C-alpha cells in the first residue's frame, strides 16, 4: 500500500506513554489509513514492544521496528528508509498531539515548498500530580528557566531555528541526508541547521500543538538538563551555527562561578565580584520564582527557586563536560 505520511516514533522503555501516544495518532483528523506508523525501538526491556505489537495486530499500518543503535537519530533514519511516503513526521512517545496536528503540519509543507520542517507549540504537562513534577512543568514556561524558544513561548507564526516533533518533505532527506548518528541528543538542532543551510526554512505555527510530559523529580530534571547541556558541548565540534545565545548562558554562568571561585582564593577583590554576580543571579531567580508562584500557587515559590538554579547549573556543567568529551566528533561528517 502507498502511504502519504511516514510517522516515526523512537522509543526506549516507553510502556507508560506509548499507548496514549499511538491513540493520539490514530485519532488524528488526517486520514489514519494514509499513515505508515513506525515505532522504532532501541531495545526496550519493559512492555513497550508488547504494547506496540498489540496495536499492530489491530491496525495493519502500525509496525514495530528494532533499532540496534538505540539512540533517536538512528531511529529517525531507520524509519525514513523503511517507508516511501513523501512526507515524514517525527513524533515523541512522551507526548500527545492535538487532533489536527499532522493535518496542519502537512498543510504547512504543501503550502510552501521552501519549508523544510514545520512544527508548533509544545505544552508541558506534569508527569504526575506531585510538587516537583508540577514545579518542572511551570519552570518550562519561564523565559528565565528555559529561554525564549518559539515552541515554548511563541504566539505568532514565524520562521525559526528549530521546532520539536517536526514534519519534513522527503526531498529534504534526499538533499541533506539523515540525522547524524553520533549525536545521542541535539540531533534536531544540527539537522535543522543543515536544513536551513540547504536553502529551506523552518516554520513555527502556534496552531500546531503537542503536549509533552516533563520529568517528575528534581533529580530527573537535572539529569535531563545535564544531558541536554552535554549535547550542546558536542555541537561546538559539529555545527556551531546550531548553538544560540540561550544555549550559552548556562555555560557562562557556571564558568563564571568556577573562575570567580578560583580567583577569589588568590585575589580578595574577586570575592566581592563573585558575590555580586551570585546576588544578581539569585535576585533574578527570586523574581522569576515569585512571578510564577503568584500565578500558579505560593507553594511553588521555594521549589522553583531551587529548581531554577539546579537546572541552570546542570545544563552549564553538562556543556563543559560535552566540550571536552566531544572532541572525537570534530573530524566526522
Task: List where the protein language model places each region.
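Short aromatic/hydrophobic "clamp" motif used to bind/position activated sugar donors
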Residues: 88
Amino acid at each position: 500500500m502507498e502511504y502519504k505520511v511516514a510517522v516515526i516514533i523512537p522509543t526506549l522503555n516507553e510502556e507508560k506513554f506509548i499507548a496514549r501516544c499511538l491513540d493520539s495518532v490514530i485519532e488524528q483528523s488526517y486520514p489514519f489509513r494514509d499513515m505508515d506508523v513506525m515505532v522504532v525501538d532501541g531495545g526496550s526491556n519493559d512492555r513497550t514492544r508488547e504494547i506496540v505489537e498489540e496495536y499492530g495486530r489491530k491496525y495493519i499500518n502500525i509496525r514495530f521496528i528494532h533499532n540496534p543503535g538505540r539512540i533517536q537519530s538512528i531511529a529517525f533514519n531507520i524509519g525514513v528508509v523503511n517507508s516511501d511516503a513523501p512526507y515524514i513526521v517525527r513524533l515523541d512517545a512522551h507526548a500527545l498531539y492535538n487532533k489536527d496536528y499532522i493535518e496542519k503540519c502537512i498543510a504547512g509543507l504543501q503550502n510552501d515548498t521552501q519549508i523544510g520542517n514545520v512544527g508548533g507549540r509544545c505544552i508541558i504537562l506534569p508527569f504526575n500530580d506531585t510538587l516537583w513534577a508540577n514545579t518542572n512543568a511551570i519552570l518550562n514556561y519561564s523565559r528565565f528557566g528555559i529561554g525564549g524558544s518559539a515552541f515554548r513561548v511563541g504566539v505568532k507564526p514565524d520562521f525559526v531555528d528549530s521546532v520539536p516533533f517536526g514534519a519534513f518533505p522527503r526531498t529534504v532527506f534526499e538533499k541533506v541526508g539523515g540525522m547524524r548518528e553520533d549525536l545521542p541528543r541535539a540531533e534536531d538542532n544540527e539537522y535543522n541547521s543543515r536544513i536551513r543551510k540547504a536553502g529551506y526554512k523552518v516554520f513555527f505555527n502556534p496552531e500546531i500543538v503537542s503536549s509533552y510530559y516533563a520529568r517528575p523529580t528534581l533529580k530527573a530534571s537535572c539529569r535531563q538538563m545535564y544531558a541536554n547541556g552535554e549535547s550542546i558541548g558536542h555541537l561546538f565540534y559539529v555545527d556551531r551555527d546550531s548553538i544560540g545565545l540561550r544555549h550559552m548562558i548556562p555555560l557562562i554562568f557556571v564558568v563564571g562561578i568556577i573562575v570567580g571561585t578560583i580567583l577569589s582564593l588568590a585575589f580578595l577583590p574577586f570575592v566581592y565580584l563573585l558575590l555580586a554576580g551570585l546576588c544578581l543571579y539569585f535576585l533574578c531567580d527570586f523574581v522569576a520564582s515569585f512571578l510564577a508562584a503568584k500565578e500558579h500557587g505560593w507553594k511553588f515559590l521555594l521549589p522553583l527557586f531551587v529548581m531554577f538554579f539546579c537546572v541552570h547549573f546542570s545544563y552549564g556543567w553538562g556543556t563543559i563536560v560535552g566540550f571536552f568529551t566531544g572532541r572525537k566528533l570534530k573530524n566526522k561528517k
